From Swiss-Prot:
Gene3D superfamilies: 1.10.10.180, 1.20.91.10. It comes from Influenza A virus (strain A/Equine/New Market/1/1977 H7N7). Disulfide bonds: none annotated. GO terms for molecular function: RNA binding; structural constituent of virion. One of its GO terms (cellular component) is virion membrane. This is Matrix protein 1. Residues 1-164 are annotated as: Membrane-binding. Keywords: Host nucleus, Membrane, RNA-binding, Viral matrix protein, Virion. Belongs to the influenza viruses Matrix protein M1 family.
Length: 252
């Protein structure tokens, strides 16, 4: 796996699924392929994206700045600086300085990532802030190692919390989760159906599913009533795709 592929993988792992994730993936691919060279416009676009947490925006801004060639005097962006200040905690800053000194001795991506993984997310963000604010310099490879270590920690905690939700025995949470999944699957079906003539059927199924979820939420239903909702939807989607000659197993 190439270095940039690895960076893209880690960075995208902390971006919530949805149309915005696909957009960010495209931007990252363009940047890494040298197709997008307007850092100013890229940062302006990133700043105004909804849904993303300030830290995720900060990490993406840091990656764009590392990758896109820019004039030396280009202003640093406040939204990135604020996200990478380790919540203003002096302990984070102290640890970030110690980590920075260690990173100065590293020359490889994997070496830097290993060193960084033993620090807290706050210290890692502060260390990125040091480099972003030009208070310290490391090679691009080492900076990417720092980025990936930070993303790995964030993705780990997201995964833990996701697993807790999936394995919860609380029927109300499970019920709501099934309805949310059915709703997002319906949305994906509508997007995939696009404008082809045969799409009307898939759109109809998706629309009915969304109306059903809306009705269930409005009148309040028994927690077990949503069981199988998402799977029914997926079976419909796959039947539609078979007729279209498309095989897609990705939603399972």
């Amino acid at each position: 796996m190439s270095l940039l592929t690895e960076v893209e993988t880690y960075v995208l792992s902390i971006v919530p699924s949805g149309p915005l994730k696909a957009e960010i993936a495209q931007r990252l691919e363009d940047v890494f392929a040298g197709k997008n060279t307007d850092l100013e416009a890229l940062m302006e676009w990133l700043k105004t994206r909804p849904i993303l947490s300030p830290l995720t925006k900060g990490i993406l801004g840091f990656v764009f700045t590392l990758t896109v060639p820019s004039e030396r005097g280009l202003q640093r962006r406040r939204f990135v600086q604020n996200a990478l200040n380790g919540n203003g905690d002096p302990n984070n800053m102290d640890r970030a300085v110690k980590l920075y000194r260690k990173l100065k001795r590293e020359i490889t991506f994997h070496g830097a990532k290993e060193v960084a993984l033993s620090y807290s997310t706050g210290a890692l963000a502060s260390c990125m802030g040091l480099i972003y604010n030009r208070m310290g310099t490391v090679t691009t490879e080492v900076a990417f190692g720092l980025v990936c270590a930070t993303c790995e920690q964030i993705a780990d905690s997201q995964h833990r919390s996701h697993r807790q939700m999936v394995t919860t025995t609380n029927p109300l949470i499970r019920h709501e989760n099934r309805m949310v999944l059915a709703s997002t699957t319906a949305k994906a079906m509508e997007q995939m159906a696009g404008s082809s003539e045969q799409a009307a059927e898939a759109m109809e199924v998706a629309s009915q599913a969304r109306q059903m979820v809306q009705a269930m939420r409005t009148i309040g239903t028994h927690p077990s009533s949503s069981a199988g909702l998402k799977n029914d939807l997926l079976e419909n989607l796959q039947a539609y795709q078979k007729r279209m000659g498309v095989q897609m197993q990705r939603f399972k």
